[in-house]
From Swiss-Prot:
Induction remark: Induced 1.8-fold by hydroxyurea.
Protein name: Fe(3+) dicitrate-binding periplasmic protein FecB
Family: Belongs to the bacterial solute-binding protein 8 family.
Function: Part of the ABC transporter complex FecBCDE involved in citrate-dependent Fe(3+) uptake. Binds both iron-free and iron-loaded citrate although it binds iron-loaded citrate with a higher affinity. Binds different forms of Fe(3+)-citrate as well as citrate complexed with various representative Fe(3+)-mimics (Ga(3+), Al(3+), Sc(3+) and In(3+)) and a representative divalent metal ion (Mg(2+)). Can also bind various tricarboxylates in iron-free and iron-loaded form.
Fe/B12 periplasmic-binding domain boundaries: 39-295
Assigned keywords, A-Z: Ion transport, Iron, Iron transport, Periplasm, Signal, Transport
């Protein structure tokens, strides 16, 4: 009798395992998991955002060795995790030590270590660094399916769609807006082919198109004048920022945004590093506040 019970139990486990089997198309091809992963390591911030959206907790995150790189809204859904280094160069040793049963990697950043990662655990390869808003939502849906939360993710995406529509209704449709990141010697315009640019476009705003095939071109003040947005939103990566120097240039006052005092600084982590459901909602909320001349929430 005991042997029979053990046989039935083993069969039940097999049925449960196959009940959770999922197959998707990732950036490498067909990807299948036979059971729901329990020990997940993510190598991009957007993947942590997606897991948080369905309350799945990763054991490891490539957080650039700084937990505050993760948005507070995302952290609220997670428990303390192990950092596995930077997104650009995650530590294979740290990842292996966690004994993951799923690694979610970025097809742009991690193609070079894909085979090495596969020696540790199954690797779901998705876009993150160079994705658009629509592609990010598709990736979130894939992640939801692979962690056994397909229905929950679909519900969260519907909620997200409704929230974004509410924020969009509070913005003047068709307003020309430009967002860019500013360093000491460089300003990068995020066009509608980038994640942030496409989030703003989804809100009904008029975002610059790609320039000469470049989705995130480095431009000068004269080129910015040619774009001439009604609103200019800037994420300053450095304290010494080229845009701050431009503001002392006589040409600056020729910008419509400058003339109307519609130049705003935004959090670089939220607007440029993070991508995902929570991140898009924060950007939408920030944009409404900016357009209505309200102070932004300080990110901690």
């Amino acid at each position: 009798m005991l042997a029979f019970i053990r046989f039935l139990f083993a069969g039940l486990l097999l049925v449960i395992s196959h009940a959770f089997a999922a197959t998707v198309q990732d950036e490498h091809g067909t990807f299948t998991l036979e059971k729901t992963p329990q020990r997940i390591v993510v190598l991009e911030l957007s993947f942590a955002d997606a897991l948080a959206a369905v309350d799945v907790i990763p054991i490891g995150i490539a957080d650039d060795n700084d937990a505050k790189r993760i948005l507070p809204e995302v952290r609220a859904h997670l428990k303390p995790w192990q950092s596995v280094g930077t997104r650009a160069q995650p530590s294979l040793e740290a990842i292996a030590a966690l004994k993951p049963d799923l690694i979610i990697a970025d097809s742009s950043r991690h193609a070079g270590v894909y085979i090495a990662l596969q020696q540790i655990a199954p690797v779901l390869l998705l876009k993150s660094r160079n994705e658009t808003y629509a592609e990010n939502l598709q990736s979130a849906a894939i992640i939801g399916e692979m962690v056994g939360k397909k229905r929950e993710m679909q519900a969260r995406l519907e909620q997200h769609k409704e929230r974004m529509a509410q924020w969009a209704s509070q913005l003047p449709k068709g307003t020309r807006v430009a967002f860019g990141t500013s360093r000491e010697q460089q300003f990068n315009l995020h066009t509608q082919e980038t994640w942030t640019g496409s989030v703003l476009a989804s809100l009904g705003l008029n975002v610059p198109a790609a320039m000469a095939g470049a989705s995130m071109p480095s431009i000068g003040l004269e080129q910015l004048l040619a774009v001439n947005p009604a609103w200019l939103l800037v994420a300053h990566y450095r304290e010494e920022s080229i845009v701050k120097r431009w503001q002392q240039d006589p040409l600056w006052q020729m910008l419509t945004a400058a003339q109307k005092q519609q130049v705003a600084s935004v959090d670089s982590n939220t607007w440029a590093r993070m991508r995902g459901i929570f991140a898009a909602e924060r950007i939408a909320a920030d944009t409404v506040k900016i357009f209505h001349h309200q102070p932004l929430t300080v990110v901690k």
